[in-house]
UniProtKB/Swiss-Prot annotation:
Gene3D superfamilies: 3.30.1490.190, Winged helix-like DNA-binding domain superfamily/Winged helix DNA-binding domain. Keywords: Cytoplasm, DNA-binding, Iron, Metal-binding, Repressor, Transcription, Transcription regulation, Zinc. The gene is fur. It comes from Neisseria gonorrhoeae. Homodimer. This is Ferric uptake regulation protein. The keyword S-adenosyl-L-methionine does not apply.
Length: 144
């Protein structure tokens, strides 16, 4: 996404345009397929020669989550990771050995969840599905 789009996205979300917010949003655009922790954001920015304090990073990540720019997940590692909210629903499979995260969408799983909710008198408004296993790379390395 271009800087102009990022500025518009921040303004549309009701957030003031600041240097740290632009840098962090740009970083998530560059790493759109990854799930990044606050520590990852800090490290990547430092590698790029950008110095933003860890407290500021946490604050911006929270603001972005509240504004619907980022989604927060808590995988097995215990620390929060964030990804751009692309507007599409997907679920996650997480490797318990190396932490690799694979995103997927399965219409059959979605339909089954809706059916279970309906059978129990619910209407699903949101959900998150995390599956944990051992990825093929770790299986090949014998990390069962």
């Amino acid at each position: 996404m271009e800087k102009f789009s990022n500025i518009a996205q921040l303004k549309d979300s009701g957030l003031k345009v600041t240097g740290p917010r632009l840098k962090i949003l740009d970083l998530f655009e560059k790493h759109a397929e990854e799930h990044l922790s606050a520590e990852d954001v800090y490290r990547i920015l430092l590698e790029e020669g950008v110095e933003i304090g860890v407290a500021t990073i946490y604050r911006v990540l929270t603001q972005f989550e509240q504004a619907g720019i980022l989604q927060r997940h808590h995988f097995e590692t215990g620390k929060a990771v964030y990804e751009l909210d692309k507007g599409d629903h997907h679920d996650h499979i997480v490797c318990v050995k190396c932490g690799e995260v694979t995103e997927f969408h399965n219409p059959e799983i979605e339909a089954l969840q809706d059916k279970i909710a309906e059978e129990n008198g619910y209407r699903i408004v949101d959900h998150a599905l995390y599956m944990y296993g051992v990825c093929s790379d770790c299986q090949a390395k014998g990390k069962r």
